[in-house]
Amino acid sequence: MSKKLKEQAANDASEGDAIKVFVRVRPSESHDADAAFGQCLEVRLPDTIIMHSKPEPKVFTYDHVTAANTTQESVFTAVGKRIIESCVGGFNGTIFAYGQTGSGKTFTMLGPCEDGDNFHHEMRGVIPRSFEYLFSLVNREREKHGDRYEFLCRCSFLEIYNEQIYDLLDPASLGLHLRENMKKGVFVDGLIERAVASASEAYGVLQAGWHNRRVAATSMNRESSRSHAVFTVSIESKEKKAGVSNIRVSQLHLVDLAGSERQKDTKAIGVRLKEAGSINKSLSILGNVIMALVDIAHGKQRHVPYRDSKLSFLLRDSLGGNAKTYIIANVHPDAKCFGETLSTLKFARRAKMIKNRAVVNEDTQGNVMHLQAEIRRLREALCMKGAEGSIPRGPSESGDSQMSNSSTESNGPVSGQQSGSSSSSKWKKYFLEAMSLRDIVEVEKREMREKVSSLEELCSKRDQVISSNKMIIKFRNSTIDMLQKTKNKALLKEDRDLLNENLKKEIEQLQEQLEHNPFVMRYVVENQSLRAQNKKLKMMEAVRSGEAMAATKAEELETLFLELREGLSKNRRYSSTPVDGEKVPTSTLVILKSQIKKLQDELENAKQEHAEQEEMTRTTRLDLESELAAYKKANLDMEKTLQGMKIKNRMDRDAMNDIHMQTIKSITTPKKVTYQLRSRTVLRTAGEETPGGPGFAGLSDNGSPLRSHSTNSLPPSGDILVTNSSPAMSEEGIIDEEMPEHVIEQCNEALTIELQKLQDKNANLQQQLEEHESQKHKMLQNSSKLDHQLQQITELYSTESQAWQEHEKDLTTRLAEATIQISTLQRDYEMTRGEAEDFKVMLQAADKEIGQEKKQKSKVTQDWDRVRAALDAQVVRLENEMCGQSRELENLTEDREQLQDAYNTLQAEHEFQQQREADLENRLKGKKAEITQLQEEIQKHLEKLDSERDKSMRLTAELRQGDNTKKDLLDAQELIDQFREERDDLLHRLDTEALKLSSSKEDLETVNSALTAIKKTDVEQKEALSSLMAALQGQKGMVKDKEEQLASMQMQLEDTRGQVSLLEAALEEGKASGAGLQSQIAALEDRMHAQAGEYQEQIEQMRADAMDANQHQKELLKELEKQSEELTQLHKQMKEKEEEYETKESEHKDTIESLEEQLEEVKTNLSTVVVELDEPESKKRKMADAQAMEIESLRDSEKRFKELSSVYDNMRDQMNEEIRSLKMKADELEDVRISKEILQAQHTALTYEIEQVRNEMAEKESSLKDEVNHLKRDMERQKTVLASMLRDKDEAVEKLYTVQTTLDQVKANEEILQENMDQVMEELDRTSALESTHFKEKEDIKSKLEEEREEKSKLTKDLTRLKEVYEEAEKKITELGGHQNPKQKIHHLQAVKSENYFLKEEVESLEKQLGKAQSDSEQMKRDYEALQKRLTSSSAEPPEEAGATTCIRCLPHSKRIMQTQTA
């Protein structure tokens, strides 16, 4: 894809994807009968349109507004070019025209309809020009990219007629259906698509479909579109680059909408009226969609009714979706179309507020290797951009550079005396490079070995974990089998001990698993590798910037999280209502208690984990401190050994110097061994040329050896160059004698062999010494580490032992106190056991009651469930009705808004018509006043004419009576002539006034007809307004009825909800009561079980610790039994007393009753039996006194019983408190015991580790000895290998030298190619820039040429019109040729001649302008052809400077053309 299109797409994306609106005002035609009404629009370029209305004019602002005289090319330049460039760049695009019928939509989109071939017409529309521009862009891309750019274009053409979709390319097709897919989106099923490769083929497809479109004539438009036409162009481009294919797919929708119509304007009846209804319905749905999208853009929640119409559903992506959309709003400027124009402008203003989300529809395909290479390339480009072009060189590049530098240095000119030094420097550089490569390989090998060792350790730990898991499974299976055996029985002591042992072993296995966890080792390895990667990544600036951005983003998110949490806490605080403690149900309390218990367990686990973590950190800290101390000690030892080595090296060097001086003296002093010692002049290294060659610089011209001075020390790497002649030799004349060659060779060989042996022996000894030193250093380091650990362990052991002793003392004191309290606990146990039995009986009774209550509750719940189901069904029905009512209410509100909008437009139109009516009435009054004035002037002129006639008649009579004199006749003749001229003038003026009067009468008639039409329209509008008001009132009444129905439904719903809430409350109360009883029973059971379990555990724990207090316990038990027996006796006595009291009370009641009966009987005989009555009253008093005494005694016994029960309760509470305290103490003792066991286990583990370390030290010593012996043997083997390696090294160096020379040549060639490539790229950039400028200039010239053609066609039309006017004028002249009045005829001919002359001048000026325009167009054609030739030549060959100058020379001509156009 070209750079221009990418930049254009980027610019479009940056500007935003809002729907853009272009408003075009059509010209007012002369044949309109109401053209005299004037215009209601005023255009202010470039983006404002003003609509004249009362009380204030309405101002609308859009993206672009054009006047009536605009050209088709300017419309396409503003609308079509950017959309088509975006489509070629991969975006979807849509252009559609909107407006009332007859506003010029089809003309804008297609062109003039009267011409059959309107695709090549000068006035062709947006669609044909879009084809031309699209394929010009495609051809441009093909010329630029060649075969790498593939293009496929498919066209389809459909129409929507009466909400049915028809394929215009298939006339026999029936109604098609819209489908929706995840990949394609919305598409038409079964629609024909034809592939096109040029603009002419696309023209053919459009023309073939256009003939099948439904078009009909109305009173407002000769060829009115009766359907919505959608022409779709699917563009698919494929660009191949480095094996990767970038595929871009886009769609271009070109839509010609049918116009909105009014039946009173179009006079449509029958089928046309039905078509107009469907058109208006689809357009109103489109308006509803745009209103919903505008509401969504303003933040409201709205449903967008895309599916209400086929048109809106098909254009869903174009309206608020993935597309760039341009709307051309066509409006009529005349006053008669005021309402439709206002609604169109409002629609366009609403559409301008919609935002689309356009994205590039691009996909990448290719081979996996190519895609990975592309990803690598992009990452490298990102790294280069982040590092600002500075890429670090790798070791291979540095090595290559060093080798190239060395080669360049070796290739330079060197003198004969420095050949030995250059060869030695070359060998040294090669050696250093080899050593650096060896170091790199060693580092990699070390890393791989560490990785392998870590993986082996990981495998071993994983094996240990597997074995420990197997052991754990085995222990758990055994415990499961044991528990299954003793499922229905109590556990024996042996089984319990076995279970505890298994659990302890399982815990040990788990601890071992924790110590040898493979995941920890794996995480360690991964951590190391990730740290290394992290270091590498942190060096990159892109990663640093990404981290900074991530940190800032994390801070922002954290602040946002804190703000949200504060808001939630505030909401909870505000929303939470205080609830009384009495109203909280028991189920919530149980849930809260369980949550508290869970939280306590989690807290205990966290504390335990915290303690374990502290223990682990303490052990790791001890290990690290010991390692640190060992490293410090090892560093000190190393420094000491280093100082010793330096002193030793200095001494060795002094000794070697002494030996060297002695050897020189021994060589030079004796006289007998002169010949043997002369051979010690030179010792050379292996592999170099001998100095005795033909090129040796130490020989003179005559071949005699030159003398050289003796060296004071041996040169490095075993090279000895000594040329020495002592004074004694010179005295004896040995110098004059020549040395035999075989003697020199034998001496040299003997000395080299001896020196090589000494060097080998020295190297072996040095290596052994270094190995022993390293082993000794490691051993010392380990021993120091172990000593430090041992010291730390002993210190820790001493502190722990002291703490343990203190703790043991505390435990003994606590144990003594616990034994004292056990006796009291035993007593409490017996008491609670009795209470437990009582509770069991109570629980059984409570279970029976609960069962009965459960039955009752199940019946009640079933009844409530039935009632609740019925109420739920009623609620659902009411909610459905409410949803339907709310939907109807929304629809009614939408209809109300639409009616209100229509009412507003009608109101504005009515006000505009009233204003126009007032203007016309004023104009009519003015015309009437003018007519009256003209009539008065005519009357005056007629009267004057009559007086003049009378005068002429009198003069003629006087002339007939007598000829007085010739002079009087002449005067009279002159007067007659003057009168005649005045009469002609008056007649001429009368004719003109008559013409004016006729014209004013015609104007008056037109005004009257306009007034009548306005009155009719006013009446019709008033009727429509009244009907609308009636409909609005009806709608309001319906809305009120619906609201009342909704209110009643809501009341019913509230009542049913209240009933449901009451029923639910009653149900909840029943559930709560049942749950309360169940919770009470469960609490009692839990408390009983818990107390029984606690007491059982306490007794089992304290039996073992309190065996010596059994006797005391037995005594207490006896006393307790006695007290219980006394209590039972007291209970029995109480029961007996109560029974006696009840019997006596009954007897007393019987006696009272009998006495009352006797009293009734005795009342009659009262006077007679007074003496007999005293005896029973005394008996009764005695009996009452006795009963009172018994009652008082019973009350005293009851009081004593209550006191005893209170004492019993107090004792029981004290015993419970003592049991709790003893339990806490026992727990503390258990914790102390566990900590003691842990310390003992740690102590044993540390002693075991120390023994293991000692054993390992001994094993390592023995293994080190074996390794030393093995290394000695290896050294002997490696000596032989070294010799072969040296030979291989020489061969490799020679090969390396040859490769280096070839590499230098390749690098030089590469630099030349890179320079050529840079030049080619610069030329390519220049050509692309020139091509883009040429393309812009070509398109500008093309658009200007099209505008000139359009102006030319307009001028030809004006010329033909003027010719027609001229011909009509000639006809009128010929008609006036037979005029009777000669003077009037002469005046008329003179006026016609002047008019003819004026028209001829105008025609000549127009012909001149036409010729000039033709010459300019021909010149522009020539320039255009020249530009095309230059473009083809520039695309075929790289541009030269001459081409650039010619292109620059073309610019003044285009400026000249522009100047002529402006002129």
Curated annotation (Swiss-Prot):
One Pfam family name from the record? Kinesin
Q: Which residues bind ATP?
A: 99-106
Could you state one GO biological process linked to this protein? microtubule-based movement
| Domain (Kinesin motor): residue spans on this chain | 18-354
A GO term from the CC aspect: spindle pole
Q: Which UniProt keywords apply?
A: ATP-binding, Coiled coil, Cytoplasm, Cytoskeleton, Microtubule, Motor protein, Nucleotide-binding
**Localization per record:** Cytoplasm; Cytoplasm, Cytoskeleton, Spindle
Please note every region of biased composition (Basic and acidic residues): 1418-1428
Keyword Coiled coil present in the record's keywords: the answer is yes
What residue ranges carry the coiled-coil annotation? 436-517, 586-646
Q: What is its main location?
A: cytoplasm
Q: Where is the composition biased (Polar residues)?
A: 398-414, 701-715
Record GO terms (molecular function): ATP binding; ATP hydrolysis activity; microtubule binding; microtubule motor activity; plus-end-directed microtubule motor activity
Stretches with biased composition (Low complexity): 415-424
Region Disordered, annotated ranges: 387-424, 686-720, 1335-1356, 1409-1444
Q: How does it assemble?
A: Homodimer.
To which protein family does this belong?
Belongs to the TRAFAC class myosin-kinesin ATPase superfamily. Kinesin family. KLP2 subfamily.
What biological function has been recorded for the protein in this entry? Answer: Plus-end directed kinesin-like motor enzyme involved in mitotic spindle assembly. Plays a role in positioning spindle poles during mitosis, specifically at prometaphase.
**Family matches, as PANTHER family:** KINESIN-LIKE PROTEIN KIN-12D (PTHR37739:SF8)
* Record-given protein name: Kinesin-like protein KIF15
Q: What is the lineage of its organism?
A: Eukaryota, Metazoa, Echinodermata, Eleutherozoa, Echinozoa
Tell me the gene name: KIF15
